[in-house]
């Protein structure tokens, strides 16, 4: 099936933030001490899903589930991401959102974290190098280090992970990153992960995403994007924010009442606002589905923000990232879909973001085969009629990095473990 755009097939922007808590966003938690005017504006123009859950309470597995419609605990996929130089966690041949949309004529771009590893082996000088002996010097950078581009995306600007010696203790390694465009060093420089500029990361991918929108609108010529014809686009924007390290840039420091963490969320909100503005400036807003969510709940440093600032990143929920308590998997989910989702509405039905593939497949009339999106259940009906509670939605399953499972269905939560805790919950908080 091919989509004839004719300005009718909608563009899709999907923002998947990193460790953004349900309680960080004003439209989800009015008591938040962080101003999020752009997210609030998006909510006013669309639907707030008040009970949306990620496929896992941890970064990589959550992204695997979102992009494949398959639970990451199947085949132990992504319960732990493993070694820094493991191969791409999405299996070769597994249908992804990008591959599905590309199959009906979409141009697909990813900009941000990725978080699902890469085809490192193809770029090694010696493909037989043992994992623990691989370092940045092991690669032939004339060969691309690919991840998104071999899983359905036409373009990527991503922070590729590298393991490097810890400057404080050279006997151990730490993880760092380097910007790669379509698998190659983005600046044409020597790759030097020890000097990765975290402050430049969010501004850089934001600027590039704006340029991508301009190129899709025909107001910019950019060969690197590989846009060969006018076609609808899918932009998967997955910034490493507000994940540690907390690096808000100078204009955003002091703009919240929740310290550096809150200021970093304000910068994220500004970044999202710039994408929204670029769509409006280029006449694309009314033909673009715009969705914002997060890969899991907030990092456990949020407990110190409670003590210091009185800001609850998990809102009134218990649990944080990695936990099977709801604060680990319940996340903001905002959808603006002109002509389909009623503006200023709210849906209370428990849904799983693993349903993204089935939702878009239903809208486009795509029939998924028995091996694709096996755990994905459409929530298109909830988008069209958000104030209708649908008890027939199937249970949502999610898990901790340990592999402990939890199930959310209607008003119930079942945790298949002695406790929902995986991160450390301080005694004073209980």
Segments the model singles out, each with a brief description of its role:
Residues 1-429:
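Formylglycine-dependent sulfatase
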